[in-house]
Swiss-Prot record:
Listed name of the protein: Phosphonates import ATP-binding protein PhnC
Bilayer topology term: Peripheral membrane protein
Domain of life of the source: Bacteria
Name of the gene encoding the protein in the UniProt record: phnC
Subunit structure: The complex is composed of two ATP-binding proteins (PhnC), two transmembrane proteins (PhnE) and a solute-binding protein (PhnD).
List of residues binding ATP: 37-44
EC number: 7.3.2.2
ABC transporter domain ranges (all copies): 4-248
Key words of the record: ATP-binding, Cell membrane, Membrane, Nucleotide-binding, Phosphonate transport, Translocase, Transport
GO molecular function, one term: ABC-type phosphonate transporter activity
Length: 257
């Protein structure tokens, strides 16, 4: 059984724009799968359809054999609990402490009123501190999140997903706004948790070299369709030219070396 399955998935926006065209993919447990393509190719739409931040028009998406497309109410909340999300712009409560932001990964496990009052059990705080230690910012736990650098804020996001105890992490252009050194640190963190914890990573990346260096599998989208799906080691410049519909520009190759 695949961890994530896209079955005949299509997305058409109200204005008639086709975001996804008949996508069929199987993502296996423990993969580090990178989605690449031009802006507007459907990368974010595909990624965000997994946890239903974007609903699809037709087809079905399964998480560990269960349809998240048809899930509602408590069943949907429980499925989303197993899917962590990392955003390009961090999606943190800037004025809250680092620890409080990481603890928000536990929200799906408790009644809303307890979360509003900040009544997290001791066990959750231990999980949060462990997550911060794993991404090397435990010493920042009591600082306001907006006092940290962009790379450190993205590590808070990763720690939040770890605290959520997700088996799947979706990352939507997580290093697009970071400098090369910080990019390497964040990507190394993601690879480490993928390899050490067996967490499945499905990530959108803009830079070709990053995709080849960190991905075990590359999925190329062009105009909402999958035009390449294979090992990162076999993704040549010609393959990327096919995905992008043109020769790759130098600023699209930027890696972390």
């Amino acid at each position: 059984m695949s961890q994530i399955e896209f079955k005949n998935v299509s997305k058409v926006y109200p204005n008639g724009h086709v975001g996804l065209k008949n996508i069929n993919l199987n993502i296996e447990k423990g993969e580090f799968a990178v989605i690449v393509g031009l802006s507007g190719a459907g990368k974010s739409t595909l990624l965000r359809s997994v946890n239903r931040l974007h609903d699809i028009t037709s087809g079905e998406i399964f998480i560990q054999g269960k349809s998240i497309t048809k899930a509602h109410g408590k069943a949907l909340l429980e499925m989303r609990r197993n899917i962590g999300m990392i955003f390009q712009h961090f999606n943190l409560v800037k004025r809250s402490s680092v620890l409080r932001n990481v603890l928000s990964g536990r929200v799906g496990y408790h009644p809303t009123w307890k979360m509003v009052l900040g009544l997290f059990p001791k066990e959750d705080k231990i999980k949060a501190m462990d997550a911060l230690e794993r991404v090397n910012i435990l010493d920042k736990y009591n600082q306001r999140s907006d006092e940290l650098s962009g790379g450190q804020q993205q590590r808070i996001s990763i720690a939040r997903a770890l605290c959520q105890e997700s088996e799947i992490i979706l990352a939507d252009e997580p290093v697009a706004s970071l400098d090369p050194l910080t990019t390497k640190q964040v990507m190394d963190d993601l690879r480490k948790i993928n390899q050490e914890l067996g967490i499945t990573i499905l990530i959108n990346l803009h830079f070709v070299d990053l995709a080849k260096e960190y991905g075990t599998r590359i999925i190329g989208l062009r105009d909402g369709e999958v035009v390449y799906d294979g090992p990162a080691s076999e993704a040549t410049d010609d393959v990327f030219s096919e995905i992008y519909g043109r020769t790759i520009k130098e600023d699209e190759k930027l890696g972390v070396n």
